[in-house]
Amino acid sequence: MEWISVWLAATFGAAMLAPPAYAEETTDPRTNVEHLAARVDAIDPATFPYANLDRAQALAADVPTGPFDQVVLHHLRVSLQRLGGGDAEGALSRLNGVRKLLEQTPDVPPGLWKVFWETYGIAALRLGEQKNCLGHHGAESCVLPLRGGGVHMEPGPANVARNCFLRCLEEFGDPTVADRWLLNIAAMATATWPDGVPEQWRVPPETFAPETDFPVFADIAPAAGVAASGLSGGSALDDFDGDGDLDLVVSSWGLRDPLRYFRNDGVGEDGTPRFTERSSEAGFDGQWGGLNLIHGDYDNDGDYDLYILRGAWLGQVFGRLPNSLLRNDGHGRFTDVTIEAGLFDEWPTHSAAFGDLDLDGDLDLVVAVETFPGEKPVPARFYRNRGDGTFEDVAEAAGLAFTGLVKGITLGDVDNDGDPDLYASRWGEPNLLLVQTGIGSDGLPHYEDRTAAAGVAEPIRSFPTWFFDYDQDGDEDLFVASFGGFEGDNLEPVARDILGMPSEGERCRLYRNRG
């Protein structure tokens, strides 16, 4: 699997980390939705790292004339781009051509054959997921261990994948835990696990046995009408239309993926809630993308408004997409008031939080900005709610102008003094605990860094985070998820961790508040 990591880094990394050409802040009179559309339309698919099919087409037209192994790796890279764009069948078609090339060439290094079979197995397994987990989606689809309705109804592609990974383990030496793991997944998909997996490669069923007596949750999304397909995104579950039941809003990270609103129509005779999509009626047309979203009643009118966060993971080259503040009229209909509220901003972000930081009775807004290494450091925003529907950024004066590749922020009263403190999860550097020291003579809350004293700087490559009282002693405890060692296609540490083997992956942290 290491060769694949090299190709993906070479393909994506340069585009993601290249020094950006900074754009000027937009000041023209267009609406926020028009700004968003213009930004998305201006992105060049030839350079955008996630426009995989465009990149595959460009790569396919530029076949190298160098050494044989470089030619093969080039074709494998094109196949992976097609796979990343969702075209598993196209990837396999090109891989079949690579196989013929390898078979017609004498003395092919075993390592090159192994990389080929790993790539072929991944493409076949993905095709099986598309045909089954998506094409025949049900409550047990893609839930490990695969069983019942999770077993593939069309097992052909997964069976091909099973044979590929078994070959990698048995024919080339130096077997990897990642190949072992994928062999077992493919066997589950074809109902040949565990007995159909050779004992030396078998992942024992007890690996998936629960360690505690914890309730099992069933996936009712298909029955409820909310099994929406999309990329990773955010969600908000609350009563947005004021009828007493919980509605659902979901975003999706794709540049033109729609924001979706599912209205709760009540519980059916079988006890399952029923939802109806009302995205256009909710005013969501043109509200594209967003890896995350939050909700809160910023205007104190008794209903929940939305804030959509955009640009995450895209850097300052591609992530200059405006966020959106959507005001709820109380009946599940929303209006984009970003510009009128003074919140127009185009720096990439993944993380924000509503909270009454200045204790004046209305919700303020903290928005963290993602800054990759080598990019212009852009500080977080602390938008103080003026109480008239508008905000002002006072982050510098309040001590909240922190920077970094921020992947999560959360508010909580860690010292039980009645005001909200802030924790920021930063990927690639120590995290921050900023404790409020009180309201100053300027009327602003003031914060100071207490990270070292509290001992909560890790994990260094962290991700989502939240405060909660896990031990029910009245103090806010802190959970910080890790992404260290698990980035991208790096399956090996994930599999090793699940199997109880030593792993390079960085551990999550649960910090108990000792009061």
Outline where the language-model segments fall:
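N-terminal secretory signal peptides that target proteins for export/translocation
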Residues: 1-3
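Bacterial N-terminal signal peptides
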Residues: 5-18
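Acidic, glycine/proline-rich Ca2+-coordinating loop motifs
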Residues: 23-63, 74, 81-515
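Glycine/serine-rich loop-strand microenvironments at binding/catalytic pocket rims
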Residues: 70, 79
